[in-house]
Amino acid sequence: MKKVMMLALALGASTSLAAPFVYPANWTSNKPGDVQTGGTFRSVNLQDFKTLNPFVSSESPNLPAVLSAGSLLGYNPVTGNYAPYMAEKYTQSADKRTFTFDIRKGMKWSDGKPITVDDWITAYTIDSNKDVGSNTFDYWTINNQPIKVTKVDSNTLKVVFPKADVTAIEFLSGIFLPQPTHVFMPVWKAKGAQGIKDMWTISTNPDNIVTSGPFMLDRYVRGERAILKKNPYFGEWNKDSAGKSLPYLDGIQINIVADANAQLAQFLAGNLDTYSPDNRDKLAQVKSAMDGGKVKGTLIPNASARASSDFMVFNMDDSATFKTKLFSNVKFRQAMSMLMNRDAMVDLALGGLGEPTYTSVYPVYKDWIPSGMDKYKFNPTAAAKLLAELGFTKKGSDGILVDKAGNKLEFTLITNAENNRRQSYAKVIQDEAKKVGVKINVSAIAFNQMTTLLDAKDNFGRRNFDAIIIGLTGGGQVYPVSGPSVVECKGLGDGGNLHMFNQSNKCRFPFETQAVNLFWKGRAEFDLAKRKAIAAQIQRNEMENQPYIQLAAQTVHFAWTDRVQGEYNRPQINSLNASTLFGPRDIALTWIKR
């Protein structure tokens, strides 16, 4: 999953003295002279945050990412390039495997302690340990060979990749984040992996949470809000183009509003600073409110395709039961894909503002998606034929298909209660399946409960589900075909892995092994055309085997009030340069107009 913090290119030459990182002027639509400091940015999240622990967090969005400054390199949305951020400079070896970084001097954690080379060594030591179960554990190997990190001296860090990897630059900007040695290493040495996993729960005293980013946690009220306050040390090493310390804001308030319609009401009432309408009706309400002067602000409809996915995934951990054996049969999954009325989903759930999807590559990356991906598009007649080949030729008195052994074609489909869009998808699926004799019982539960069901444990009783509708967001732009935590099927960490359909810790199906091999082949390919050809093979493999039955994707729309300023310039406003919580802006450059 993409965790790249959007950070600008440093302006000015490096010196032997501590040099701050300078955000360039073209990162914001405002001039430094326009800026007013102070104030609180008001945002919203659909569910409670699960943890403050950066090593075990797997949700999106999550507070550890919000509280992080970023890493060695940063991504520039204006140029699309990567450049030094927490590193002052770096070199790359001729074979593209070794990166050597000079760490920026003068950086501090939110408790005032210096950020040093040791903090990357701590992150490497803990994050790459399988027993910790980090969501990014799989990123620490390249085709099962480990990435190695060493401290050269007090200011120099070396990262050696086992093979040349085209996505290394993204790993160094968004995955390999420093963690405070003075906080985590004593626990690691005394209590090991379990001690780390027990740290920084959502109930931990905010005074004990140490962060690198522009904000730190002030307080968290479960079910109500997260309050962030300015990190007083961030501005010492982060400046705007006029030399002013960042961030401009005093703080951020993230309200927990577990209903998408209630979020809209909050924005229309003037209680939120930014909002992203997700269907035609909500977009129309926002436009009407702005046209009528009820809300003074900016609306950008259809800014771009969305960099996210929604899909249905079956539990294929084994074939021990009638249902898991059925779910493990590719003909069944192909049939289910042909029962997905994606056009109806776009019309009913998205108000026509979206498109059907057939591949895990987000539609925003259209030039990466090959033709012919809709082979298993909506076709109930063909779906019924495949189900008949599996023995479901007759219906019982209740209208449900049944095989010769008396097994009914019935399963439960779970999605998260906070997400109206996915619940609408589930209703469309349920209705279409019923027409051919498949009974689907839809259940909506809390998102955190749903992700707990998906997480792997030695006792697979925790994965007691049939099918789930969920989604992914983020990912890399260099090679936008998923990531190791989604692809790898063995050597899985204890929780947080995203190989959702099979958590047996073994590759049960040939297509899984094929996907793994193709994925790593593409990572080693630096020729763009050849890399896209490999990505096409991966997507065709997905299409034929349907491990994740893709549904539909929204177009993205952005709205914000005149109260909040500092958004990107219009060419940079798209789903790739926006966050769920803050919209199309860098939060360090955001300010409140009063």
UniProtKB/Swiss-Prot annotation:
Q: Name one GO biological process term.
A: peptide transport
Disulfide bridge positions per record: none
GO cellular component terms, semicolon-separated = ATP-binding cassette (ABC) transporter complex; periplasmic space
A Pfam entry, by short name = SBP_bac_5
User: The organism sits in which domain of life?
Assistant: Bacteria
The signal peptide annotation in the UniProt record is: 1-18
Q: Keywords on this record? A: Signal, Transport
SUPFAM superfamilies for this protein: Periplasmic binding protein-like II
Task: State any single GO MF term.
Answer: peptide transmembrane transporter activity
Gene3D superfamilies named in the record: Dipeptide-binding Protein, Domain 1 (3.90.76.10), Dipeptide-binding Protein, Domain 3 (3.10.105.10), Periplasmic binding protein-like II (3.40.190.10)
InterPro entries hit by this protein: Peptide/Ni-bd (IPR030678), SBP_5 (IPR039424), SBP_5_CS (IPR023765), SBP_5_dom (IPR000914)
Q: What does this protein do?
A: Probably part of a binding-protein-dependent transport system.
Q: Which family does it belong to?
A: Belongs to the bacterial solute-binding protein 5 family.
Q: What is this protein called?
A: Probable ABC transporter-binding protein DR_1571
Q: What is the lineage of its organism?
A: Bacteria, Thermotogati, Deinococcota, Deinococci, Deinococcales
